[in-house]
Amino acid sequence: MKANPVFSLYIPTKLVFGCGEIKKLSSEKLPGKKALVVISSGTSMRKYGYLERVLAQLRLNNVETLVYDKILPNPIKEHVMEAAAICREEKCDFVVGLGGGSSIDSAKSIAVMACNDGDYWDYVSGGSGKGRPVTKALPIIAIPTTAGTGTEMDPWTVITHETAQEKIGFGCQLTFPTLSIVDPELMVSIPPHLTAYQGFDAFFHAAEGFIANCATPISDLYALEAIRLIYKYLPVAVADGKNLKARAKIAWASTLAGMVEATSSCTSEHSLEHAMSAYYPQLPHGAGLIALSEAYFETFRHDCTKRYMKMAEMITQIGRAHV
């Protein structure tokens, strides 16, 4: 970070955070009356009742719903285009992403393509994308059931182009969620290995954002607190997934790390992992980051010594007047 930083801060998302706060969905002012609810192709949203709880809260708010349930762990362009076409045909006026980062990222991309012509990759600014400007998008509501991506508080969405084998992040001011509800009670069913992978994703959002050249005073505050919370509470959440205090602390750390992404940036570690999981879509994103991390951070050890020391200081002070 520069000695005399100049920066701007723009996070237009309303955040509702806390155990049991999913109930606020029935009373919040919502951006429309017909929603496409986007979930993964897995079983957990229905098995644990999360989908029905969200649909019930939306009904109480006089919102009609459709469910799109094909999203993969590494979401693909084909599904974005298919769901966007459904949005247009059914005249949905906002999109709800319910689940992990893949569902919420997909909801953001669907919201873009519901309002813009052409192909999704026309708007992506990397690889074979054409970088067309996005002029409008449907409003987005994010309801995470995992703690890792922080996508509920940033504009970024990561989608895979299967044919080109490209996995690229994209975002703009229009892809910030309008409303995000982070309820740690929706996260207690995550199995230990996924809790760990997702927690490390949040850790690397914070650590990368802290060493990035574009780090800001506000992103530093978010990053260091996220690192402290993850170091202290991720082992607890992995060992005991029903521990709501640990789940809440990791959920807050993930949200903070998402705010790091909105006020600083991930570094090339994330880009390297995106290339890995574009070729190997079964690879969990967090696991790929873990595999890269030792060699990656060793490479920058001498360039970021003071920043590394500050992160270490936050970790070694665990237990000293911190909660």
Question: What residue spans do the PLM features occupy?
Answer:
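Carboxylate- and glycine-rich phosphate/diphosphate-binding segment that chelates Mg2+/Mn2+
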Residues: 156-264
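ATP/NTP phosphate-donor binding region
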Residues: 1-94
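Glycine-rich phosphate/pyrophosphate-binding beta-alpha loops
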Residues: 148, 255-286
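Glycine/threonine-rich beta-strand-loop-alpha-helix active-site module
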Residues: 78-185
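Gly/Pro-rich interdomain helix-loop hinge
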Residues: 279-282, 286-320
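Fold-independent oxyanion-binding glycine-rich loops
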Residues: 13, 19-20, 39-41, 71, ...
